[in-house]
Every structure is written in structure tokens, then in C-alpha cells.
Amino acid sequence: MDKLSIRDLSLEGKKVLVRVDFNVPIKDGKILDDVRIHSAMPTIHYLLKQDAAVILVSHVGRPKGGVFEEAYSLAPIVPVLEGYLGHHVPLSPDCIGEVARQAVAQLSPGRVLLLENVRFHKGEEHSDEDPSFAIELAAYADFYVNDAFGTSHRKHASVYRVPQLFPDRAAAGFLMEKELEFLGQHLLVEPKRPFTAILGGAKMSSKIGVIEALLSCVDHLVLAGGMGYTFLRAMNRQVGNSLVEESGIPLAKKVLEKAQALGVKIHLPVDAKVAKQCDSGEDWRELSIQEGIPEGLAGFDIGAQTIELFSKVIQESATIFWNGPVGVYEVPPFDQGSKAIAQCLASHSSAVTVVGGGDAAAVVALAGCASQISHVSTGGGASLEFLEKGSLPGTEILSPAQS
């Protein structure tokens, strides 16, 4: 990695501002999934072992900005952090201002302080309009560490502006290093071959950039989920009432043509679980794509033959990247295809398997096989943008590695 690492910093007795991604699902004050908190712990534990004073900054959700909203408070994160650390973690009721400055001043080496949601201030998301927000955050610390890969595709103050105020002192945390290693080295730079990318999800248009980027480096491209029906329509297949982006059909045709020119093998569903609607998961059946899906029915998951086809492609690959479910995984039995993909990846222990965050990561967790995947990214949109562009605003801006 060509960026400064926390291993390169002289941390004893120093204050370190750490941008973490604690944007976890919270319901009724309880955290539903703490994977992102757990993923940041190696960096936090390391800093504490080095006798640094650790100041954590994060966001949760999408508050309006400019006002405190209890629904988006980081308060529910405190007991989870305390459970991992084994000691009290104070929460500053604001991330800037006198109350935050006092909390930082009182923070001792070897302890952790959590600042309240940075998105309660407009200066976080609109740093060009209010540069003072970044300046105030930066004033707290001697060093800056970015361990928030999942947010690093955004040019927000705590990710992009603040590190610019730490010349030669803005480093990557361990989670960030791991993300860059797997998405960069193992996928973009030196993938073991054959290299297969599996892309699902609803909309093709939101992933066209990463599709075109992947065409230049993969051997196989598996396309399914809602976007798969747009490609099938582009091939003049009858898909009934399945989700199709009409405006995306010309783009899909261009992708198919480019793949053929580059020698990339495209794999699309050959059958589907169909129903009139997916709400209840009832009255479904499997139909062949060759025969076509009639009007009045829509595909909500891949069928048994497609599972077998995709599994064979996976088993014959040495590197696999997966982003986006291949069906409506929230509604059984339309979860079977996505779970089968997850289990197939998990069983292929000799391959490098990378799951690109978001819904695919949720499926892997539901299937109970996350620990058997080489790397489950903490960034959905961030992982796709990194694969498309090769870097992110929040990673580009970090200090260069020491020579």
C-alpha cells in the first residue's frame, strides 16, 4: 500500500482523531448488526496499546444537518464499544464547540472518546460552504486515521477535508488497509485467474461504470437480480413483468458487444422463480428463460438450473467478487438463489472470495458463512466506486507512505 499506515506513527501520549464508519442499523435504540463496529476494533485496540488518546468520529444515517435528531444519535453505540473495550467510553453531546473541546482536553492516553454524529452539522456534508467545521475537528489531535472505507467515496469534511489539515500525519487504519489490499491488490492489480465478477441488485444504470471497468479485468461476468432482466430484454428474451430499465437496454447491448470483443464470458439466468407478486412468497413456480416469462408474471429469484450454472462458474474460478443479491432475498423462497451463491463462495476455500458490502454482505450473514469468505467489505457503494476508479477521495487524500 502506498499510503501512510498507523504502524508508521509515533503515538505514545498523542491524541489521534479516527474517522470510523459506525453507520449501523439501529431500531428502538438497539443495534441490529455491529459488524462495522467490530471491524474497527483492531485499529482502536492498536492505538490504545500504543498509549494514544483516541477520538472517534462517525455518522449514523441521514439527519437533516444543523439540528440534533435523537433517532440518529450515536448513544446506542456506546454500550457496544464499552463491551469490546472493557471500560467506560464517554460520548460528547456534540462533535464541535466548547463541550467537545472540554471532552477532548480531559481525554487521557489509553482511553477512548466518542464524538456525537458529525452529520448533525451542515459543515460535514457541505465542507466547501463551511470550512470551519473541518478546522475545528482537526484541532483536537496530533494525528488523523481513516478507518471508514465505507464512507470514503464521499468528499465530506471528516473524510476529505480534515486529513488535508494533517500534512504527513494522515494515515490508514487496519480496516482501511485490508479493504485496499483485497479490492486493490487481489482484484484490480494481480487477481488469480480465472477471475469472475457476480453483479446483482435492482438497477443496471447505477452499476454501469463498474461493469465497464470490470470488463477490462475479468474473465467471467455473471449478471442477475433485477439488472439481469434488462440484459435479457436486450437479448430479446420475454421477461413478462420483471423489473426492466427500458432506458438501460441500449447500454446493456453495448456491454454485451464489448464483452464479446474482449473475450469476457457473460453468464445470465437460464430460469427464474416467478410469481404475480413477491410480497408473500406464495404461488410461485420456476420457468425457463428460453420459453419466456408471460405477461402478468415477474421473476424474483434465479431458478435451480441457474444456481447450478452459476455454481459451476464459481467453482472453476480462482478469484470471485460478488456485489448485489440475485433475488428478492428478504422474502422466502426468493432468498434461495442468493443464499446458494453465498454458500458456494464459502465452500470454495482455495479461491480469493470478496463480497462487496451492502445487500450481498447481508445475505452472507444470513447464510451464516461470513467467516468462510476471504473478505466481506464494509463498503457497498465505496467498493463499487473503488473498482470503477481505482481510488476514492478519502483514500487519495491520505499521506503518502514513508520511503
Curated annotation (Swiss-Prot):
**Lineage of source species:** Bacteria, Pseudomonadati, Chlamydiota, Chlamydiia, Chlamydiales
Any one GO biological process: gluconeogenesis
Q: Which reactions is this enzyme annotated as catalysing?
A: (2R)-3-phosphoglycerate + ATP = (2R)-3-phospho-glyceroyl phosphate + ADP
InterPro entries from the xrefs?
Answer: Phosphoglycerate_kinase, Phosphoglycerate_kinase_CS, Phosphoglycerate_kinase_N, Phosphoglycerate_kinase_sf
Q: Name one GO molecular function term.
A: ADP binding
Disulfide bond annotation, renumbered to this chain: none
Mind naming one GO cellular-component term on file for this protein?
cytosol
Location of the protein in the cell: Cytoplasm
Q: Which UniProt keywords apply?
A: ATP-binding, Cytoplasm, Glycolysis, Kinase, Nucleotide-binding, Transferase
Q: What is this protein called?
A: Phosphoglycerate kinase
Annotated positions binding substrate: 21-23, 36, 59-62, 119, 154
Matching entries from Pfam families are given as:
PGK (PF00162)
This entry's Enzyme Commission designation comes to: 2.7.2.3
> Which PROSITE patterns does the record match to this protein?
PGLYCERATE_KINASE
Q: How does it assemble?
A: Monomer.
Pathway where this protein functions:
Carbohydrate degradation; glycolysis; pyruvate from D-glyceraldehyde 3-phosphate: step 2/5
For the ligand (ATP), the binding residues are: 207, 299, 330, 357-360
Family of this protein: Belongs to the phosphoglycerate kinase family.
Where does this protein have coiled-coil stretches? none
